[in-house]
Amino acid sequence: MEVAAKLRGAGMSAQKARLVADQIRGKSVEEALDLLTFSTKKGAALIKKVLESAVANAEHNEGADVDELKVSTIFVDEGLTMKRIRPRAKGRADRILKRTCHITVKVADQ
């Protein structure tokens, strides 16, 4: 049994979120939560919330035992990119790209 949770439109680039996602792929849920709790990366807090949601979904909807769950799949896709403008000297302007991402976490029995 595999249960998923998604966060769409997370306010960070997919490249930065993937750094954290790669660390917990394949680990047990308990080990992954410990790693995310003590990580200093911004993406760790977002991924931790999605992982906790997936665990809650598995426990509530499927009646799974939390101690036997592991992170079977985790991936980060690019979301919308919002374009903003920063005024510069002499009437020029630079384009600012505010990137977002979609985080998907799937947990399964070991």
Swiss-Prot record:
Biological process according to GO: translation
Keyword Ribonucleoprotein on entry: yes
A GO molecular-function descriptor: rRNA binding
InterPro entries registered for this protein in UniProt: Ribosomal_uL22, Ribosomal_uL22_bac/chlpt-type, Ribosomal_uL22_bac/org-type, Ribosomal_uL22_CS, Ribosomal_uL22_sf
Subunit structure: Part of the 50S ribosomal subunit.
PANTHER family found in the cross-reference section: CHLOROPLAST 50S RIBOSOMAL PROTEIN L22-RELATED (PTHR13501), LARGE RIBOSOMAL SUBUNIT PROTEIN UL22M (PTHR13501:SF8)
S-S bonds: none
NCBIfam families assigned: rplV_bact (TIGR01044)
Function: This protein binds specifically to 23S rRNA; its binding is stimulated by other ribosomal proteins, e.g. L4, L17, and L20. It is important during the early stages of 50S assembly. It makes multiple contacts with different domains of the 23S rRNA in the assembled 50S subunit and ribosome.
GO CC terms in record: cytosolic large ribosomal subunit
Superkingdom classification of source: Bacteria
Keywords from the UniProt entry: Ribonucleoprotein, Ribosomal protein, RNA-binding, rRNA-binding
Species, as recorded: Saccharophagus degradans (strain 2-40 / ATCC 43961 / DSM 17024)
RNA-binding among keywords: yes
Family named by the database record: Belongs to the universal ribosomal protein uL22 family.
Name of the protein described by the UniProt record: Large ribosomal subunit protein uL22
Gene that encodes it: rplV
